[in-house]
Swiss-Prot record:
Function: Specific class of high-redox-potential 4Fe-4S ferredoxins. Functions in anaerobic electron transport in most purple and in some other photosynthetic bacteria and in at least one genus (Paracoccus) of halophilic, denitrifying bacteria.
Keywords: 4Fe-4S, Electron transport, Iron, Iron-sulfur, Metal-binding, Transport
GO biological process assignments: aerobic electron transport chain
Subunit structure: Homodimer.
A matching Pfam family: HIPIP
Membrane-spanning ranges: none
Keyword tRNA-binding in record: no
Gene (name only): hip
Identification of the protein by name: High-potential iron-sulfur protein
Organism name: Rhodocyclus tenuis (Rhodospirillum tenue)
Amino acid sequence: GTNAAMRKAFNYQDTAKNGKKCSGCAQFVPGASPTAAGGCKVIPGDNQIAPGGYCDAFIVKK
């Protein structure tokens, strides 16, 4: 499912922004494969986060 309220709060989008994307973010919880949808530590209850997406909570993965 998705968490529409939290997605909106963080301005989530399904596309990368300035080269930043969910798969490169410390908050992203990867799905079954590198291209599969995953989860996010700041958007609870949402398992449809795109690896190539972006939101304002982006923190570069170390």
